[in-house]
Amino acid sequence: MKKMMMIVALGVATVGLAAAAVWYHYDDERPINQSELPTKAQEFISEHYSNNSVKHTTIDREISSTEYEVVLDNGTKIEFNESGEWRSVDCYSDAVPEAIVPSKIRTYVKENYGTCSITELKRERYGWEVGLSNGLDLEFDSAYRLTEIDD
């Protein structure tokens, strides 16, 4: 009986270690051509950044998700999920396209930070993160209510 338990324990440990090794080594980040992006991502770039060219594009495959990152010639970084929906846009010193900013967030920023532009916009599971040109970061919940201001 002891021998059988030892064999079962050894088998479980071996399978566990093999699964952990696969999980650890599965991260696959590599450059790709712009044409390999999902159609939605290509359309987003064409619609909102037609005056810019793509500097480089990468795909990051993990066990649970696939993400794409695009860097434009002006330094703007855009992240897309596996279906091509944008997750974040970081323009650093330039303003993000107004068309992608939810109207309630755009209105709040204009009313409270009139001279500032939105330079970073992230969609999060719980809401939105907004980076302003004055260095402030604002967080909004999914109903577009301000929940946090971080400097």
PLM feature spans:
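Bacterial Sec-dependent N-terminal signal peptides
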Residues: 1-26, 45
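Interaction-mediating elements
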Residues: 25-151
